[in-house]
Amino acid sequence: MNEKTKELPACPVETTLTLIGDKWKVLILRDLMPGTKRFGELKKSIGTVSQKVLTAQLRDMEANGLVHREVYAEVPPRVEYSLTELGQSLKPILDAMWNWGEDYKNSVTGN
């Protein structure tokens, strides 16, 4: 058993929330689902997240195997982020959140 496995909660729902339970992580997943993005593109698409917070969230997601970070030896340096296979496996969860959010908005607005 590795160190990460020992730290995971017994409840699978809690485990999932441990990995993606932050507002920014869910939005990062949403914005990387279509494909690779550079840091600036991610920051712009997410909106109000600070550079410091986005960097910390991406590092955490990379450490947990959800995001791949590719650094290119160019001037200026180019860094791209993409979802790993594990990150892509969260698509049905994000799709369900999208559908639930649409249903909720429609029920509240009467549409």
Regions found by a protein language model. Name each.
Residues 30, 88-111:
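Amphipathic alpha-helical dimerization/coiled-coil segments
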Residues 57:
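Residues within the DNA-recognition helix of helix-turn-helix
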Residues 1-8, 105-111:
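HhH-family (HhH-GPD) DNA N-glycosylase catalytic core used in base-excision repair
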Residues 70:
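Short beta-strand His + acidic residue motifs that chelate non-heme Fe in jelly-roll/DSBH
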Residues 73-97:
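Basic, amphipathic "hinge/linker" alpha-helix immediately C-terminal to the N-terminal HTH DNA-binding motif
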Residues 7-53, 77-80:
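N-terminal helix-turn-helix DNA-binding core of bacterial DNA-binding proteins
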